[in-house]
Regions:
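Phosphate-coordination/substrate-recognition cap region in phosphate-metabolizing enzymes
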Residues: 38-101
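Acidic, His/Gly-rich catalytic cores of divalent-metal-dependent hydrolytic chemistry
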Residues: 188-208
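Glycine-rich phosphate-binding loop signature in dinucleotide/nucleotide-binding domains
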Residues: 45-48, 134-141
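Domain-level recognition of soluble alpha/beta enzyme cores
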Residues: 162-186
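Short basic (Lys/Arg) and small-residue
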Residues: 148
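Loop-to-helix element that buttresses phosphate recognition and phosphoryl-transfer chemistry
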Residues: 6-63, 113-128
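Extreme N-terminal starter segment of soluble prokaryotic enzymes
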Residues: 1-5
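Active-site signature of alpha/beta-hydrolase-fold catalytic machinery across serine-
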Residues: 66, 154-158
Length: 208
């Protein structure tokens, strides 16, 4: 059985500012860096990781780095694990889009693409294909894949035969297990974030 460990990147600058990021390359905050370290420690203590993959965006690569460095593994980057492309909404504050483009946002919440952006089916198909290739290339191994809220959500929805709308976005630096038996995917534990609870009372320190 192949076990894929999907980790959403730590908090980014745009996450903190409540802005749409999409595929723009935005760095982690100090809190995000600490989340990556703590999640890395959790992974190293609970799994024997054989390979590391990541979206090619720096916030995902930085989240994979603590594990890769500790194990002396290379990080294999693949742009197919990127976040959904959000088109005209990239860089915009979420509150502004909700207020000024309410109709567009309502349609987006029901599964339509953002104006000029990527469709949900395009996102789902590219992430699924990349995941399938990684799983087939690593039989009976445990693989870390650092990605994004939207891309992980799309994959979990497809494997769970659900719609994106009904699957919640994973929290920053949370861990979700995807299992592969050589033919089919199945979901293991999803959205694990208990290891981050020590940070909840410390966030003000990192946001100042």
């Amino acid at each position: 059985m192949t076990k894929l460990l999907f980790v959403r990147h730590g908090e980014s600058i745009y996450n903190n500012e409540r802005r749409f990021t999409g595929q723009k390359d935005i760095a982690l905050t100090r809190l995000g860096e600490r989340q990556a370290q703590i999640t890395g420690k959790f992974l190293l203590e609970n799994y024997t990781i054989d390979a590391v993959y990541s979206s090619d965006l720096s916030r995902a690569v930085a989240t994979a780095r603590p594990v890769a460095d500790a194990l002396g593994l290379s990080i294999h980057t693949d742009p197919r694990f990127r976040e959904v492309h959000l088109g005209d909404w990239t860089d915009e504050y979420i509150s502004v889009v909700k207020a000024d483009r309410a109709d567009e946002y309502a349609r987006y919440c029901q599964g339509e693409s953002a104006p000029g952006g990527e469709s949900r089916s395009q996102l789902r198909d590219r992430v699924y294909q990349a995941t399938l290739e990684v799983a087939r290339a690593n039989p009976d191994k445990t693989v870390l894949i650092t990605a994004h809220g939207g891309s992980i959500r799309a994959l979990l929805a497809k494997i769970g035969e659900d719609t994106n709308v009904n699957v919640p976005i994973s929290s920053n630096a949370s861990v979700s297990e995807v299992l592969f038996n050589g033919e089919r995917f199945a979901l293991g534990k999803v959205g694990m974030a208990e290891h981050l609870k020590e940070l909840f009372s410390m966030q003000d320190e990192f946001l100042n």
